Regions:
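Polybasic, low-complexity association/targeting segments
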Residues: 2-36
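Short Gly/Pro-enriched turn/cap motifs at secondary-structure boundaries
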Residues: 15, 40-43, 95
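Short, low-complexity Ser/Thr-rich regulatory SLiMs
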Residues: 16, 53-54, 106-108
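Short beta-strand scaffold segments in enzyme catalytic cores
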Residues: 25-28, 50-52, 102-105
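Short loop segments at secondary-structure junctions
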Residues: 29-33, 55, 84-87, 109
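Short, conserved charged micro-motifs
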Residues: 33-38, 122-125
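Anion-binding (especially nucleotide phosphate/pyrophosphate-binding) glycine-rich loop
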Residues: 39-68
Length: 125
């Protein structure tokens, strides 16, 4: 017996206005168990698939092989989908993530990302 699943997947070409150019990412506004998210990302076979749980705006990114801590182009893609299809009256979304709060602003059809500052450490040579 085949088990069916139904959900929307948005394919976005980040950093481009042209289809089939830029940096592709898949975006899914639905929460799944970790194993299911990994399977979906593997099936998509893109560098990253972003999963966003709209109950708490929690975003996670999966490559075909594993979960990753942060992905800029997939976050940009998720913000684009949010502003265009989820809440087109909004100009700000704050994603919660394992890397902290990630803010996306939309102004004049341009999306800006504000990521947390990384704390660099000096390493010995």
């Amino acid at each position: 017996m085949i088990k069916k699943m139904k959900f929307d997947i948005f394919y976005v070409d980040a950093f481009s206005k042209e289809v089939f150019s830029g940096n592709p990412a898949a975006v899914i506004f639905k929460h799944f168990e970790d194993e299911k998210m990994q399977s979906i990302a593997s099936e998509n076979n893109l560098s990253e698939t972003a999963f966003i749980d709209l109950e708490n705006n929690y975003i996670r990114w999966f490559s075909p092989k594993c979960e990753v801590d942060l992905c800029g182009h997939a976050t940009l893609a998720a913000a684009h989908v949010f502003f265009e299809y989820i809440d087109n009256n909004s100009s700000l979304i704050t994603f919660n993530s394992n890397s902290g709060e990630l803010k996306a602003y939309k102004k004049d059809s341009i999306i800006y990302l504000d990521f947390p500052k990384d704390n660099f450490k000096q390493v010995d040579e």
